[in-house]
Amino acid sequence: MLLLAAASLVAFVLLLYMVSPLISPKPLALPGAHVVVTGGSSGIGKCIAIECYKQGAFITLVARNEDKLLQAKKEIEKHSINDKQVVLCISVDVSQDYSQVENVIKQAQEKLGPVDMLVNCAGMSLSGKFEDLEVSTFERLMSINYLGSVYPSRAVIATMKERRMGRVVFVSSQAGQLGLFGYTAYSSSKFALRGLAEALQMEVKPYNVYVTVAYPPDTDTPGFAKENQTKPLETRLISETTSVCKPEQVAKQIVKDAVQGNFNSSIGSDGYMLSSLTCGMAPVTSIMEGLQQVVTMGLFRTIALFYLGSFDSIVRRCMMQKAKLETVDKTA
């Protein structure tokens, strides 16, 4: 009887595995596609642009610094696979004025055609204890990390729905899946992208438009190096419990997931665990994905409790260390 039950379970899983591709989105063909990348002058954004260009896409790079844009353009063009490919550069702050963002998207579409894939990669990170952060820091991060993704997405979505095809990618962070010491401003702005993505996916899925939320870990980028200069000790020690990823590795995974129409894009085993653990009511791209989340949830929650205990221990040790230093200073 037990053997029969096991055989039935295996047969059921195999059936799901075979049926799953039939209900998954049709992959987006990148050769000849128009890909817009905000925050594309450096870091993950630039690497995403390179990865798409390698596969034959036409690229529109959007960022604030014109000099960095032109430098990135030269680097990306080295990876062309045919002489028809184009890299268009547009200098604009995507978080300030929606009408300006809408206009530059129209310009890009007039030159390179309708946008097939938008990658919202513009963002920044600032860390610090809640009471030490200025209120303006919360406003700034919400503007750049959240509205800086809302505006470009709003500018392309109508055309995608009309064409009944497209991809919209939101680059969040693992700090957009769990809140950590020092990230009260950053995490909240990245968590907001998850809610936006889930609601938007439900709206546009009937039009064959698919949304991807990427949750990269700490990545070796200029932004990460700058963030480390002011990162609280507790935040730095927690971050050091995992390794730093290369932006090329992160970009390759994001592009792969976006092309496939996957809602979640995670990097590495920790990323996979976090995405499964925090899936909530998020959409799934395949039956197998949903089944994996159901099966692994209990195990991953158990592992997560050990992680949380470790992080809390780091915070307590730092607190005790500071208290000792204060005592020494008072007695000196």
Curated annotation (Swiss-Prot):
Signal peptide from the UniProt entry: 1-25
Enzyme class: oxidoreductase
Keyword Plastid: no
Lumenal compartment segments: 291-292
Protein location: Endoplasmic reticulum membrane
Annotated keywords: Endoplasmic reticulum, Lipid metabolism, Membrane, NADP, Nucleotide-binding, Oxidoreductase, Proto-oncogene, Signal, Sphingolipid metabolism, Transmembrane, Transmembrane helix
SUPFAM superfamilies in the cross-refs: NAD(P)-binding Rossmann-fold domains
Record-listed E.C. numbers: 1.1.1.102
Entry-linked InterPro entries: KDSR-like, NAD(P)-bd_dom_sf, Sc_DH/Rdtase_CS, SDR_fam
Membrane topology qualifier: Multi-pass membrane protein
Active site, per annotation: 172 (proton donor), 186 (proton acceptor), 190 (lowers pka of active site tyr)
Catalytic activity annotation: sphinganine + NADP(+) = 3-oxosphinganine + NADPH + H(+)
GO biological process: 3-keto-sphinganine metabolic process; sphingolipid biosynthetic process
Biochemical pathway: Lipid metabolism; sphingolipid metabolism
Main location: endoplasmic reticulum
Any one annotated GO CC term: endoplasmic reticulum membrane
Entry's transmembrane regions: 270-290, 293-313
Amino acids binding NADPH: 39, 41-43, 64, 68, 93
Chain location of the short sequence motif GXSXG per the record: 39-43
Disease: Defects in KDSR may be the cause of a bovine form of spinal muscular dystrophy.
Family: Belongs to the short-chain dehydrogenases/reductases (SDR) family.
Protein name stated in the entry: 3-ketodihydrosphingosine reductase
Organism, as annotated: Bos taurus
Organism lineage string: Eukaryota, Metazoa, Chordata, Craniata, Vertebrata
